[in-house]
């Protein structure tokens, strides 16, 4: 089974039936999923924002959120010092750099809908292929 690191943007699309849901389902199929522990908080915050924007959908949103546990995502500890260094290098938030750090540490594909995070991941992969970059966090 292939390891993949999944970020909150991808999980929110998956749980809340967003337009990109099918794309995410295809990318995650058959994978062993991993994420930093902050994933749960980010997804819960997205659920809260959706409830505030659409109070009439509260119950449906809570039911969708409750299916997060069924996804069997391994929540991993992050080396915060290395994630901070990576955030500074890539100009990402520490939150986003945590996903990027984990993908590097596990040598796993990063599944995200966040354009800035995806660009940083691509740039790091390209640099590591050329032997001049950050190939692994470990």
Predicted stretch roles:
Residues 24-29, 65-67, 82-85:
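Glycine/charged-rich beta-loop-alpha catalytic/anionic-binding loops adjacent to active sites
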Residues 9, 44, 116:
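Anionic group-transfer/hydrolysis microenvironments
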Residues 1-38, 50-62:
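Short, well-structured N-terminal submotif of metal-dependent ribonuclease cores
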Residues 52-66, 116-123:
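Membrane-interacting alpha-helical segments
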Residues 1-3, 36, 100-138:
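Acidic, PIN/NYN-like endoribonuclease modules and their adjacent C-terminal/linker elements
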Residues 70-116:
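Active-site neighborhoods of divalent-metal-dependent phosphate/nucleic-acid chemistry enzymes
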């Amino acid at each position: 089974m292939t390891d993949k690191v999944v970020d909150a943007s991808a999980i929110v699309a998956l749980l809340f039936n967003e337009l990109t849901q099918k794309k995410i389902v295809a990318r995650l199929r058959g994978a062993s999923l991993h994420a930093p522990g902050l994933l749960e908080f980010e997804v819960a915050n997205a659920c809260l924002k959706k409830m505030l924007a659409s109070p009439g959908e509260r119950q449906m949103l809570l039911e969708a959120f409750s299916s997060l546990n069924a996804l069997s995502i391994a929540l991993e500890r992050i080396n915060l010092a290395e994630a901070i260094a990576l955030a500074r290098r890539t100009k990402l938030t520490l939150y986003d750099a945590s996903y990027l750090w984990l993908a590097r540490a596990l040598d796993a594909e990063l599944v995200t809908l966040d354009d800035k995070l995806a660009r940083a991941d691509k740039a790091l992969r390209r640099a590591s292929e050329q032997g001049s970059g950050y190939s692994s966090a470990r």
